[in-house]
Amino acid sequence: MRRGLFLLWLWMIAASGAIDALAQAPTPLKSGSDFQPAEMRRLQADDFANPGMLWVSQGEQLWRSPRGDIRKSCADCHGDAGQAMVGVAARYPRWQSPSGRVMNLEGQINFCVAGQQKSPPLAYESEELLALTAYVAFQSRGVPMSVKRDDADRPIYDQGQRLYTQRMGQLNLACTHCHQANWGRNLLTDTISQGHGTGYPGYRFEWQKIGSLQRRLRACYFGVRAEMPDYGSPDLLALELYLAVRASGLALEVPGVRK
């Protein structure tokens, strides 16, 4: 019965064609944690209880650990992450001239792993990459998102915006149907958020571990019964860039805690 009501609710959203063009940021901007139950917000705010902090601690160890043939650590180049990495995650994804492409934070970490440490890149959703990304992003907790658009990455941003408003999957839904037109409404036991990625990498109880924003985006593809893009695919990177710009001014809150 609940499944039938859920599908009916989604069908009613999909039948409303007037909201396809809504791609601008919602007003006022609200963090994903604002839509979580009080106990989740308390858990996220408590560094001793937040389960995502286990990965942050692991990332701190990896930051200092030599890697690759030349046995170089992240700290050898950047020093103390508590100083060198403040504000860095708030500026990603971004266009990187040396590589000639848009990189998210995971991509930048792997660029350094391969180029500076002469070590094989870390796999998406691997414990090491999640931990390092969480640790670097944690240094920017409380820093407002400030991803800039320029001419080089404008086509990627435009691609992300198109994907955000594009109906897809068997349910014929777009991101905007939930996170722009219906945020704040109840969907079964959850409250629909504005869809910002400022808490990722974040701990989700349904995963029982920390996960990346791309994992969460892929879950949305699965939810509307669409083909899921591969990790690191151009579509997911474009969506990440668009969402980061859309969240401009919202503070990072890594590691977020979600149901």
Q: Where are the regions that the model predicts?
A:
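Short cysteine/histidine-rich metal-coordination sites, predominantly Zn2+-binding motifs
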Residues: 89-98, 191-200
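Short coil/turn and helix-start
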Residues: 68-69, 169, 230
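C-terminal cap of thioredoxin/glutaredoxin-like
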Residues: 162, 169, 177-183, 199-205, ...
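N-terminal, post-signal-peptide region of Sec/Tat-exported proteins
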Residues: 47-80
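Post-cleavage N-terminal segment of exported redox proteins
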Residues: 2-5, 9-56, 83, 93-158, ...
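Conserved short C-terminal alpha-helix that flanks the catalytic cleft of nucleotide-sugar-dependent
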Residues: 63, 163-164
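The canonical Cys-X-X-Cys-His
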Residues: 71-81, 132, 160, 170-182, ...
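Short Cys/His-rich "knuckle" micro-motifs
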Residues: 84-87, 185-189
